[in-house]
UniProtKB/Swiss-Prot annotation:
Any GO MF annotation of the entry: structural constituent of ribosome
PROSITE patterns in the record: RIBOSOMAL_L33
Gene Ontology BP annotations: translation
Domain of life, per lineage: Bacteria
Family, similarity comment: Belongs to the bacterial ribosomal protein bL33 family.
Protein name stated in the entry: Large ribosomal subunit protein bL33
GO CC term, one of those recorded: large ribosomal subunit
């Protein structure tokens, strides 16, 4: 029998801020889902990826996938 894969799914959430028509600052709400091996990577993931809501590359930080 094969071993179970140890990788977990994590959510990478955009840190970009979008200003609404009323002047409020809100998160864009855009995210990516990635696999991560907790045995090899102990730090939280951070990537610079494209956010289509703000149309630029921004920092994405790891959050818990619900």
């Amino acid at each position: 029998m094969a071993k179970k894969n140890a990788s977990l799914l994590v959510k990478l959430v955009s840190t970009a801020i979008k200003i609404t028509k009323t002047g409020e600052e809100k998160s864009t709400g855009y995210f990516y889902v990635k696999k991560r091996n907790p045995k090899k990577l102990t730090k939280k993931l951070e990537f610079r990826k494209y956010d289509p809501v703000v149309r630029r590359h921004v920092l994405f930080k790891e959050e818990k996938l619900k």
